[in-house]
Amino acid sequence: DECVQVQEIAVELNKQAIIAFRISGFYVGERKLYSRFGFDLETMDSFISTNFLESERFDHLTYKGLHFHLNGYSVEERSLALNQCLAFSELLSQKGFKTEFIDIGGGILMNYLKYETEWDNFNHQLRRAISNKIDPITYENQGLGLQILAGVLQGELKSYPLWNTLSNGDFLRKILAHNTSAGGNLAQWAKSRGVEIRMAPGSSMLDQ
């Protein structure tokens, strides 16, 4: 739908619209990472061939890059997704599409707390509050993924990790240092293909 809308606007303005495809459906081992964001990677090849090569349906759209957004903050999942994006960019190159950048959505992990003990204390006090041992510390005593069922505290915390052992530039470096099956790492692969890797700094002004 977005391609159709952007095409219509570009035609109306008589301009070329610079676009990046947001893709999803990456594999971590045998597990597929489903997402509400983007085109499924397994369908992208046929979509591009049908709409950009075999017809002029989107002739006012100019491809420049790829983007993906994953839930959570797993370094492994981001590394594997970037690996699959780079592999897909190779396929696109064979079709005449140059990938100038790949954008990793979700942002770089930042530490909003200065000390790990502060994060540990919040986790501890949240569990006490949910168990009605102290006054609520969240709105309406929400458990943020934790809950009491049959008198037992269950679930896992699903809030943003306010303190991390791996954050800032180290978080991105860890992703880019992931080794590929062809030898070398993701950073070297991207550099050899002239692909810029982008990642938003998140709420970096709040970093401790």
Please report, for each region that a protein language model flagged, where it lies by residue.
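Active-site-proximal beta-alpha core segment in soluble small-molecule metabolic enzymes
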Residues: 1-101, 185
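C-terminal active-site-proximal or functional interface alpha/beta core segments in diverse enzymes
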Residues: 65, 70-208
